[in-house]
């Protein structure tokens, strides 16, 4: 563009020149729906005879998605582009994706119909303000979609086409003035939304899971603020149908990535864990398509806005009730459509500051949590299905290191699983998606599935415990053994239970000791999820003679809970539970109960709040 045309454009621009802004430079979004005063924006017309339907449209590709710059002495093209893309939209990336749009309308039974198609643009400005006056303005027009003006005519009638050939740029929708001041000390740089290191918020309510890596699907329908993901807007006139179509080549769309720790959670590492958890096709070459269609009624015009959307995933390193590290991964999804009454071009323009950068979710909420095995930890295999009674000798080569043991069972049932001497505590997971998948000739064939679903277990290093779990034949399970010394344990013990201890299935039974003295005893355990159970096994001090007893009470503090007290007995069929008492409300309960000396009891609490459970036992006296 020649300098004379630039000067002519600048001097005749009738944009807003008086603003209530402090002195400085600003980047401004002036809205969508601009038609330029350039003949090559007119795409031609379509004529329909009486009663026929006319369809006009266009597919905008990279070669036709040309932005138009109007720089000034102070604001060159690079300065304009970088400031606009940093605040509002990465239109360079958007131009890689084709966008289709079309309009259709039926001619009246007694008239012909002429539809003329034009491109529309989103207008951005860089302005210099001095004493509430715009003293310099550079303009950028970024391709949006299009507009079809329809005119009904009688045979032989001359059509007034002045609307199409304008000497000034004009907005067929309501103009905007969304601004952000440009810092004087900052040099605009090329936008890079796809890989950022940020101070992510890692505060979160305690999760009902042990320490480890977790991938969370947070749902679909995420869009960036400030219309960064706007595809474009259609103005649809009365009795006209409009549609927006976008064929999506996923290998031309880029994810958005943020991390709190680029050393630990790089984009490559995060993508690998997402693939472990959900087998996500992050970069495939298949073409997806979405299309939105809307028809305006006979009494008003409407506008239809289309947006690109993202599906959000989080990778977290969860340690001791806190998120130590976090990465957010926004995977390109499809799109979203918003339809409203068409705004009036004569409506007042309001100066509005930009929103804070971020995301809004417009789709349904999700919170699907999947554990993934840390690739730095070892995996051992019990290659054949375990029988009803089985002892596994932990290889000495993996002692002193945390590891996972992959196994399956020969018979569906409820199993008691514990380490030798009930230490260290164990955690058991189901291998997600592994049912009947990697068994060959009754033998595990591989351990490539690294997605795991927590069943039960605890991280407490000094808590004696065992697992009661319901296991299904042909499903794969992992037991995680924490870092241990060779002097602590060298065996895992499996036993299928035939008694009614199966009522405790899929819970951890914490073994309590130090009840030899009177007074109050506190035990804190991280709870499983709401609706599940946490169990405690205690043996009453003293010799068993079926007569002597001690007085106890059971209560919780800061947590409400429903509990059941069982006596644990053993028979040839295994362990059995005898119900002693049901508690409807354990919060600050002080009701005493007499328990036999030397007998073993299990106290099971139903989790009604997600938190650490503080179980309190009051031992009073022998009776």
Swiss-Prot record:
Pfam families: Clenterotox, HA70_C. Gene3D superfamilies: 2.170.15.20, 2.60.120.1080, 2.60.120.1090. Transmembrane segments: none annotated. CDD domains: PFM_CPE-like. Limited treatment of L toxin with pepsin or trypsin produces shorter HA-70 proteins (called HA-55, HA-23 and HA-22) sometimes observed in vivo in other strains of type C and D botulinum toxin preparations. InterPro entries: Clenterotox, HA70_C. GO terms for cellular component: extracellular region. Keywords: Hemagglutinin, Secreted, Virulence. It is found in: Secreted. Botulinum toxins are produced as large progenitor toxins of 12S (M toxin, about 280 kDa) and 16S (L toxin, about 650 kDa). M toxin consists of a non-toxic, non-hemagglutinin component (NTNHA) and the neurotoxin (BoNT/D). L toxin consists of the M toxin and the 3 hemagglutinin (HA) subcomponents of 70, 33, and 17 kDa. The stoichiometry of the whole complex has been modeled as one BoNT/D, one NTNHA, three HA-70, six HA-33 and three HA-17. HA-33 and HA-17 crystallize as a heterotrimer with two HA-33 and one HA-17. This protein can also be encoded on a prophage. The hemagglutinin (HA) component of the progenitor toxin protects the structural integrity of the neurotoxin; may increase internalization of the neurotoxin into the bloodstream of the host. Involved in binding to the small intestine through interactions with glycolipids and glycoproteins containing sialic acid moieties. Erythrocyte agglutination only occurs when the entire complex is assembled. This HA subunit probably connects toxin/NTNHA to HA-33 and HA-17, the other components of the HA complex, and it may also protect the M toxin from proteolysis upon secretion. This is Hemagglutinin component HA-70 type D. It comes from Clostridium botulinum D phage (Clostridium botulinum D bacteriophage). The gene is ha-70.
